[in-house]
A protein has these predicted regions:
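Alpha-helical substrate-recognition element adjacent to the catalytic core
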Residues: 1-164
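Noncatalytic linker/hinge segments flanking ATPase motor cores
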Residues: 63-71, 168-176, 191-197
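Histidine/lysine/aspartate-rich catalytic loop segments that bind and position anionic ligands
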Residues: 149-185
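Conserved Lys-Pro-Asp/Glu-containing loop-to-beta segment of HAD-superfamily phosphomonoesterases
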Residues: 175-213
Length: 213
């Protein structure tokens, strides 16, 4: 994003014609009451949340490292030490055990139907997105994944055996704004740059049409 993007955000005189509303969700603590790693992954590694996060915070402090990088690498190291297989398939399997706040599983169909009734004859549509510091593969394996147009979350790099060996993508609280701009501009492929200026009227979903949970 550049200064022109910020100007677009501040310009309240731009008339948008887009009729899509984006509902953008964090995951842990928003859709699910616990960090997603607590479901499946940590039990498989014989770790309590207190043990795991305590060690992560200690290593973060000792090594002066980013906490998200530390927690992802710590999972790999623990799995290797225990001989526990971690790959895309196992992460998705663990994701299928994620529990939600009451009502979440039915929320998406209900709000979609509500929007249709609210719109009347207008052609308003709703799109759902996740921007999370959790693991993309786990979210892809959860029961509500089918409702999301795009899932932006942390990812691993995998070797030719399918074994994760280093973080490939980390989404911190600060960097989440980049992904809001991706939704805004309709540039959902994370390999595509969003730095080029795009006129407001060409943007897929204006910020006024976004609700962030």
């Amino acid at each position: 994003m550049d200064d022109r993007d910020l100007i677009v955000m501040a310009n309240d005189k731009v008339e948008f014609q887009q009729d899509t509303v984006a509902l953008v969700y964090d995951f842990d603590g928003t859709l699910s009451p616990q960090a997603m790693q607590h479901y499946g992954v940590l039990p498989a590694l014989d770790q309590t949340p207190e043990e795991f996060w305590g060690r992560v915070k200690e290593k973060r402090k000792d090594e002066g490292a980013e906490e998200l990088l530390v927690y992802m690498k710590e999972m790999i190291d623990l799995a290797d030490a225990k001989g526990e297989k971690l790959d895309r398939e196992s992460f998705r399997k663990h994701g299928s055990t994620i529990e939600y706040f009451e009502g979440v599983e039915h929320w998406f169909d209900r709000i979609d139907e509500f929007a249709k009734g609210l719109a009347g004859d207008a052609s308003i549509s709703i799109e759902h997105y996740v921007i999370s510091s959790g693991l993309k593969e786990m979210i892809e394996g959860c029961s509500i994944a089918k409702h999301f147009k795009s899932i932006f979350a942390c990812e691993f790099r995998y070797d030719h055996y399918g074994h994760p060996y280093w973080p490939a993508r980390v989404i911190s609280d600060t960097s989440k704004t980049q992904y809001l701009f991706r939704v805004n501009k309709g540039v959902l492929d994370v390999n595509d740059s969003i730095n080029s200026h795009m006129p407001a009227r060409e943007r897929a979903i204006p910020f006024d049409n976004m609700i962030y949970f």
